[in-house]
Amino acid sequence: STPTHADQLAYLGQWFYSYMRLSAPTTITCEEPAPFAVGTPILLGHSARRHKLVLNILVDALPWNIVRTHFSEWMPNIARFFSNGTIFDAHFSTSEYTYPALPAIETGRYAHHTQLFQADASHELSRAFLTLGECMKDLGYYTAAPILTTDSIYNGTMRGYDRLISTVWNQPSGIGAERAIHHIEAFGEADLFTFLHLSDIHPWDAMGFNFHTAVETHLPLDQRLFAWEKATASVRLPDFEIYKAQFRAGLRDVDRNIGTLLSYIENHYEDDEYIVSLYSDHGSSVFTPRRDEDPLDIIGENSTM
């Protein structure tokens, strides 16, 4: 009920959040003696001190030194968008895998400061380190990550975000782009800081998943079949052609789906109303040639650029 609106019953459903647009003090009660959660109000309105949209897109395991020479060919939609922006060609990750790399990105601190290295023997990020989400929230942005992994939540890296939608294992760009557009449509009356974590091109051990259908149907048999019987961490995967083909297939998905999102932004915002950054947390070992007996240089530029 509100001062100008009588009590009204409404069924809101279970196990999910509902949203209501409020313009006056409102009292919400439950007909049954059952607990319910009420989220922090989302304040609408824009400020000249902020941009209407700040969008960070993390394409997990994107080796820029490999992609750079094929950028306009492999990622034509994204390349067109950023042709009017700034492209960094000598930017390196602090780590070769996500768990320590993402906290470094979100805090601006090296891993030896955050002390976040391994999920099974870890802790919460020190409160002395402000995260990017906390800083943007303090500036008045409505902070959200419509798609991200779960491991960065428990260690405190995602502190400061008002809304998180996480999934385990897979964060496809098609779903991420759709959720981002829906998020903008829903909350675009506020100034938005939005983060997407996408895993389309992240390499995975062939013993644990199927390859892209287009990869399996186009590779010759000698490249489609390979002898590999030991479980291997993604940072140590060999340079098999099938892994490279899987990467390129995932990259096409990223370009097509994120290209749609970028076009949406261009059509709905003025040039000075938004900032978009696309980056990665580390590279990929599958582009590093080596013999079976050779050790892998996990801090080489293929893994960290």
Model-derived regions, located:
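Catalytic domains that recognize anionic headgroups
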Residues: S1-M305
